[in-house]
Each structure stands twice: as structure tokens, then as C-alpha cells.
Amino acid sequence: MSLVVQCPICQSSVPWTDDAKFKPFCSERCKLIDLGDWASEKHVIPVKSPFEAGLLDPDLLDDAGFEQDDFFKE
């Protein structure tokens, strides 16, 4: 007995087998719909920006022991 999953786009049953060409999708159409959703940014992975306000504050760099020219020394 093989595992059966739901297609993320149309919710039809998809057997999880080696010959399931588009798994977890039921068809190329559903796979391309999902790809288009990612390309148009309907789906995103939330991340914290490394450049949030205050992280590059010169006073914080001074507190960390960095001098202005430390970044360019050889």
C-alpha cells in the first residue's frame, strides 16, 4: 500500500510512488500554477532582514570594539 497525499493546488489524491511524475502535485498544470504563485510572490518565506534599523548604528559598532577603518585593513 502506497502513501496518498493531496495535491496542494486542487486537493486531488496523488499516490506517493516512484512513477508519480509531478509529486506532490497531480499534474504539470498544478505544478506550474504553484510555480507561478511563488514567482508572483503570493507565497513567501518570512525572514528577518539583517539590515533592520539600528543594527548598523555607529554607536553600536563602537560598543562592539569596531573602529571605522577596521573593515578595510589588510
UniProtKB/Swiss-Prot annotation:
What cofactor is this protein dependent on?
Zn(2+)
- Show the stretches that span the lipid bilayer: none
Q: Which residues does Zn(2+) bind?
A: C7, C10, C26, C30
Q: Which InterPro entries match?
A: DNA_gyrase_inhibitor_YacG (IPR005584), Znf_NHR/GATA (IPR013088)
Recall the GO molecular function terms of this protein's record. DNA topoisomerase type II (double strand cut, ATP-hydrolyzing) inhibitor activity; zinc ion binding
Q: Which key words tag this protein in UniProt?
A: Metal-binding, Zinc
The note on the cofactor says: Binds 1 zinc ion.
Q: What GO biological process terms are annotated to this protein in UniProt?
A: regulation of DNA-templated transcription
Top-rank lineage group of the source organism? Bacteria
> Which SUPFAM superfamilies does its entry note?
Glucocorticoid receptor-like (DNA-binding domain)
Q: Which family does it belong to?
A: Belongs to the DNA gyrase inhibitor YacG family.
**Physiological role:** Inhibits all the catalytic activities of DNA gyrase by preventing its interaction with DNA. Acts by binding directly to the C-terminal domain of GyrB, which probably disrupts DNA binding by the gyrase.
Assembly and binders? Interacts with GyrB.
PANTHER family in UniProt: DNA GYRASE INHIBITOR YACG
**What is the protein named?**
DNA gyrase inhibitor YacG
Organism listed in the record: Shewanella denitrificans (strain OS217 / ATCC BAA-1090 / DSM 15013)
The beginning of the lineage is:
Bacteria, Pseudomonadati, Pseudomonadota, Gammaproteobacteria, Alteromonadales
